[in-house]
Amino acid sequence: MTDADRFEAFVREYQDMVFATAVRLLANPTEAEDIAQTVFLRAFERFSSIGTSATAAGWLKTVTTNLCLNHLARYRARWQFFSELDRPGDERYETTVAAASNDAAEAASRQEALEQAVAALPDHQRVPLVLFHFEDMSYKEIAAALGISLAKVKTDIHRGREVLKRAMTGVV
């Protein structure tokens, strides 16, 4: 197997994780694709050291998170959070539901509603919430990564949760 083949297999193994992390943080699939490409360019440059490492997934998540945070800081004023979410026919955002299962359909409906509610949060609430719940970062780690106080992290996560609770009230 050539180096190119090994890197192609590496990308296939981790591309969904990298893309999902970027989409959760950016709430914009197009920007997430750009970040994912940059992540894999950096991975290619360091492939000899990370390609077979047991910590490759962690390295990729860290690089993805940092690139997303940098992107948010640079382009915050120009962001449009809802511009490309929920595109009909885009398989990455459609939940496959077994037609015979009402429970699965209800779960899919709740999942979609939650994803929309998270995407609708202002970035100062969404980013810490995603880092805490999806990336398993501590409050202190989030504060350090975002360059904000620990109290602000706690407040933003709390307020984000409250908005999500209100948005999810009555969702099947």
Regions found by a protein language model. Name each.
Residues 51, 65-83, 93, 99, ...:
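Arg/Lys-rich amphipathic alpha helix in sigma70-family domain 2
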Residues 20, 34-41, 54-66:
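Structural recognition of an alpha-helix C-terminal capping motif at a helix-to-coil junction
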Residues 128-132:
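A short pre-motif secondary-structure segment
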Residues 40-55, 74-76, 167:
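Sigma70-family region 2
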Residues 1-20, 30-33, 44:
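A short, charge-rich alpha-helical start-of-domain segment used by transcription regulators
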Residues 65, 69, 113, 117, ...:
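DNA-recognition helix of helix-turn-helix
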